[in-house]
Design a protein with these regions (language model features):
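Structural preference for solvent-exposed beta-strand-turn elements
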Residues: 1-196
Length: 196
């Protein structure tokens, strides 16, 4: 079977983004967003989801990081949707409760074709590195809507903002890896409607 891949480019007055995603990769990444902590998070997403991910972003960071994070989320969600394709034979659902020291984060995914985000988290710092913590929700909102997936992220325990955000990205990666994986018992798509 061929690898499920997508290449997406998005150009606006605020950002220029190129991304390639391979859902059937080995966790290789080449990430350049201009925000070091965001690069670190996307690298963790690729590595722990075993996705190959290449991201190049030229954003208006002289304003702030808002457009860079939001638009990267739109492009990642679009790449996920395109790479998943017709969803024949995939598990559709995935979830993970992931620990990182004092932090425990739940992520659950349904590749149902209906966009929805439930995000339950509180941060105690405005930024981690140069990344604004309030933009974490905006990033995942953009991913979920562009991918047309249900995405739940809930912090069950935690104190360190770096750990919380990192656990979110890794838990999402693990949940998405499960949801996009194949089950030989599934004929067609996993839906009583016959389509997703």
């Amino acid at each position: 079977m061929e690898n499920r891949t997508a290449s997406v480019e998005r150009v606006t007055k605020e950002t220029k983004i190129r991304m390639t995603l391979n859902l059937d990769g080995t966790g290789k990444s080449d990430i350049h967003t201009g925000i070091g902590f965001f690069d670190h998070m996307l690298d963790g997403f690729a590595r722990h989801g075993l996705f190959d991910l290449s991201v190049s972003v030229d954003g208006d960071l002289d304003v702030d990081g808002h457009h860079t994070l939001e638009d990267t989320g739109i492009v990642l969600g679009t790449a996920i949707r395109e790479a998943v394709g017709d969803k024949q034979g995939i598990r559709r659902y995935g979830d993970r409760i992931l620990p990182m020291d004092e932090t425990l984060v739940l992520s659950a995914v349904d590749l149902c074709g209906r966009p929805y985000l439930s995000f339950q988290a509180e941060f105690t710092r405005e930024k981690v590195g140069e990344m604004e913590t309030e933009m974490v929700k905006e990033f995942f909102y953009a991913v979920s809507y562009a991918a047309q997936m249900n995405l739940h992220i809930k912090v069950l325990d935690g104190g360190n903002n770096h750990h919380i955000i990192e656990a979110m990205f890794k838990a999402f990666a693990k949940a998405l890896d499960e949801a996009t994986s194949f089950d030989p018992r599934i004929a067609g798509v996993l839906s009583t409607k016959g389509s997703l």
